[in-house]
Every structure is written in C-alpha cells, then in structure tokens.
A protein has these predicted regions:
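Membrane-interface interhelical linkers
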Residues: 1-9, 42-68, 117
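Juxtamembrane helix-entry segments on the extracytoplasmic side of multipass membrane proteins
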Residues: 1-2, 35, 58-62, 135-154
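Hydrophobic/small/kink-forming positions within alpha-helical transmembrane segments
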Residues: 11-19, 46, 70-78, 100-105, ...
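Specific transmembrane alpha-helical segments of multi-pass solute transporters/efflux pumps
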Residues: 16, 53-90, 132
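Transmembrane alpha-helical segments that form core, pore/gating elements
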Residues: 22, 30-31, 45, 140-174
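Structural motif at transmembrane-helix junctions in multi-pass transporters
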Residues: 26-32, 79-96, 167-172
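C-terminal transmembrane-helix exit sites in multi-pass transporters
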Residues: 99-121
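Hydrophobic transmembrane alpha-helices of multi-pass small-molecule transport proteins
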Residues: 118-134, 155
Length: 174
C-alpha cells in the first residue's frame, strides 16, 4: 500500500510542478525554473543521502555513463520546461506518451534485451492510442511538438541509462 500512496503523491507533485512551470513560464526562463526545481529537490535528497551514510553512497562505479545520464536528464527537463509555457499541457503530455516506445526500442541495443512480438505489439497498440489522442490528421505539426518529442527521447535515454548503470553501480557498491 505504501508504494501506491508514494506513486500517487509523486504523480500529484509532478502534475503540480508542470502546472507551475506553465503558469510561471511567462515570467521566468527554463533555466531559472530548473534551478528552483533542483534546489527544492535538494532538501529531501540531503536527508536521504545523510541517512544512508553520507556522500560515499552516491559515488558511482560508472561515472561516464552517469555523466551521460545527467546530460540526457538535463536535456529532457530543459525541453519540457521550455515547451510547457508555450503549448497546451495536454498536447505535450500526449506526445510524451511515446516514451515507452522509445524505451523498448532502446532496451534492445543498450541493455541487450530481447523484445518479443507480444511486447512490441503492446507498445504499438499504446502508440496507436497516442496517435488517436493527438489526432495528427486534424492539425499541422508545430515545431514545439518536435521539441517535446526530442525531450521525450532524451527522457527515454536517461531512463534506460539508469537501468544500465544499476547493473554495475548501486547504493551498496560504493
């Protein structure tokens, strides 16, 4: 039950953050909002790291992969923070639902996973659902849609890299 509540709280916080980014986007740039978001995130992170044993627990055995993960995560966050004030959130969310398609496709070369026809079928059905939500046949593609797609791809790479890094570097491996 605790996991369900944690997930619900996390989703509510992400939705609140996205709405705040949209609302504050006319007054603040993406970098300013990213800085504030990161500063707020540092407070609970400080207590988590401190409780787990200090800075030694965040030392990575894969620093280059970790650096690439940080860059792709930064690119994703910047892309979303740039786009949210400039286009309807519902459209940005719908485009970002392409992430599972990217993740499954990236898991094959990056993680060496074998993806069977059932999983590909499920991903394709989900992607068709995304297309139905977007109704691309009724609108022209705006360049901001491409920014969301790039941010989504960057997010997907970051997520797959996190899984790859977890194979060699864990909190206990420091």
């Amino acid at each position: 039950m605790l996991g369900i509540y944690a997930r619900l709280i996390a989703m509510a916080l992400f939705a609140t953050m996205d709405a705040l980014v949209k609302w504050l986007g006319d007054s603040y740039g993406p970098f300013q909002m990213m800085l504030f978001r990161s500063a707020v995130a540092m407070v609970p992170l400080y207590f988590l790291v401190r409780g787990a044993g200090g800075l030694k627990v965040i030392r990575s055995r894969a620093p280059l992969l970790q650096g690439l993960r940080i860059l792709t995560g930064f690119g994703s966050l910047f892309g979303f923070f740039y786009v949210f004030p400039r286009m309807p959130l519902v459209d940005a969310y719908a485009i970002s639902y392409a992430a599972p398609l990217f993740m499954v496709a990236l898991a094959v070369p990056m993680l060496g996973e074998v993806v069977g026809w059932r999983r590909w079928s499920a991903v394709c059905v989900g992607f068709v659902g995304v297309l139905i939500m977007l109704e691309p046949w009724t609108i022209s593609v705006h360049w901001l849609s491409l920014v969301v797609l790039l941010a989504t791809f960057s997010y997907s790479v970051s997520t797959v890299l996190t899984r790859l890094i977890s194979r060699v570097s864990t909190v206990d491996s420091a």
